[in-house]
Design a protein with these regions (language model features):
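Membrane-interface helix starts
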Residues: 33-57, 239
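Short cytoplasmic-facing helical segments at TM-TM junctions of multi-pass membrane proteins
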Residues: 117-142, 224-227
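Membrane-interfacial helix-loop-helix connectors in multipass membrane proteins
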Residues: 70-93, 161-203, 211-231, 252-259
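Start (N-cap) of specific transmembrane helices in multi-pass transporter permeases
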Residues: 135-156, 230, 234
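Active-site cofactor/substrate anionic-group-binding motifs, chiefly glycine-
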Residues: 46-100, 104
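Hydrophobic alpha-helical segments of membrane proteins
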Residues: 53-65, 69, 149, 153, ...
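Short, membrane-interfacial amphipathic segments enriched in basic
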Residues: 1-39, 216-221
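Hydrophobic alpha-helical transmembrane segments of multi-pass membrane transport proteins
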Residues: 84-127, 155, 212
Length: 259
């Protein structure tokens, strides 16, 4: 195993942050100029959105089921089982829906982007694109960025709805609660700030998934082994950053809306 000094490691971190920032800046800047590769963007939307839909639906539904069961156990001690709908709605819309959807899409698509672009890098397809006058960032990264941000937004909404539906299913069938009471308490517990918070988070998560996945793919070296390493690094880094962004956005929303 090769050891490096703390100074060299710090320089590597700074260089990586710099390269990642430049990649993000170029990818975002390309959105506002031609060519935009619309067909590639729609292809990525289909792959990311439609391809991720089954796991998002299942994850959201069963998360809502478990959440309702656990909430009922705790609320029963206070005689407040009827408030299960409130807890499920708030938890899914503000936290679990955005975070779990981001993690599911990250595991599926950040790894896919890293492996796909990494394979292109080690097979010198990226260099061939540059030689032909095509900007790899504009062609490969920007369509994935736009598609991921756009589709993750709607996937999160679907996950929230499935989670609430799962909570309602368990509440009605196992906990013998009234469906009207479940949905009423859930609806009345929400304020505009909760909805805004739940819809802002997937925008940041989508940005992280696409840019991190593409960044590690484009920096791949070392053949097929390097592709595997880049794929693993992309999933780990994007997952950690999604949770970090969730914390920061939650703290910001609490400061703005007080909850």
């Amino acid at each position: 195993m090769r050891f490096i000094s703390p100074e060299a490691y710090a320089k590597t971190i700074v260089a990586s942050v710099q390269d990642y920032s430049l990649l993000c800046g170029r990818a975002v800047g390309n959105i506002f100029s031609q060519p935009r590769y619309i067909a590639d963007t729609f292809t990525q939307m289909d792959s990311i959105g439609v391809g991720s839909l089954p796991i998002v639906v299942l994850t959201g539904f069963f998360t809502g089921c478990v959440l309702a069961l656990q909430a009922a156990v705790s609320l029963k001690e206070f005689g407040a089982v009827n408030m299960t709908g409130e807890l499920v709605a708030l938890s899914m819309i503000k936290e679990l829906g955005p975070v779990l959807t981001g993690l599911m899409v990250s595991g599926r698509n950040a790894s896919g982007m890293a492996s796909e672009l990494g394979s292109m890098k080690v097979s010198e397809q990226i260099d061939a694109m540059r030689a032909l006058g095509t900007d790899p960032i504009r062609k490969l990264v920007t369509p994935r960025l736009v598609a991921t941000v756009f589709m993750l937004f709607f996937l999160t909404i679907i996950s929230d709805a499935c989670g609430i539906a799962g909570g309602a299913f368990v509440s009605v069938t196992l906990l013998k609660l009234n469906a009207g009471t479940f949905f009423h308490t859930g609806y009345m517990s929400l304020v505009h700030g909760d909805i805004i918070e739940g819809l802002i988070k997937p925008l940041f998560s989508g940005f992280i998934i696409a840019t991190v996945g593409c960044y590690y793919g484009l920096k791949t070296t070392g053949g097929t082994r390097g592709v595997g390493q880049s794929t693993t690094q992309a999933v780990v880094a994007s997952s950690v950053l999604i949770i970090l962004i969730d914390f920061l956005v939650t703290q910001l929303m609490i400061g703005i809306f007080g909850r």
